[in-house]
Amino acid sequence: MMILALLFAAGFVAIAEQLKPSGTVFEQPGAEVDALLHVPAADYRKEWVLLGSFSVLADQAEKGAKQLHVVYAEPKTVDAYRNTGVFPDGAVLVKDVFAGKTEQMTTGTVSYAGPLAGRFVMVKDRAGRYDGRSPLWGDGWGWAFYEGTETRKTVTTDYRKDCLACHEPARSHDLVYVQGYPVLNR
């Protein structure tokens, strides 16, 4: 009788699992792989390597930089890239985007980092395991932008629409503007 009760309970659990309402986190397409995209918990500005930075000029150049982009990677990612010329599977790149502040100083017109506007995160998927499982993954990377100080909830909805246009000119370098990252030179 006890065995029969256990079998009945197991069957009930299996049926209940199938009837679970759609839209739960685990049933959303790509939710499990999208969880791999987030701003790292590590203090990456202190513990990771600063790859380099870019200044994005304002529409009127004399107004200086409208944004400063500062990019970081783990030391093991830098070592692997310098040894092989490719980003290893699982590599994480974090790009801080700061609003540019520009003013006159004794050295001339200077731009420097103002408030944090957000962060881009890219996670390398060399084997393409996540391609097609989520619109945030493709072309060998996971792609996400986090506004302000947000670290988990991305505003990116589809890397093809939200990210690829800016990265396409760097396709020959795995969609990364490596020319701005002198530490990667071998």
Predicted regions and their residues:
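Sec/Tat signal peptide C-region and signal peptidase I cleavage site
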Residues: F12-I15, K20
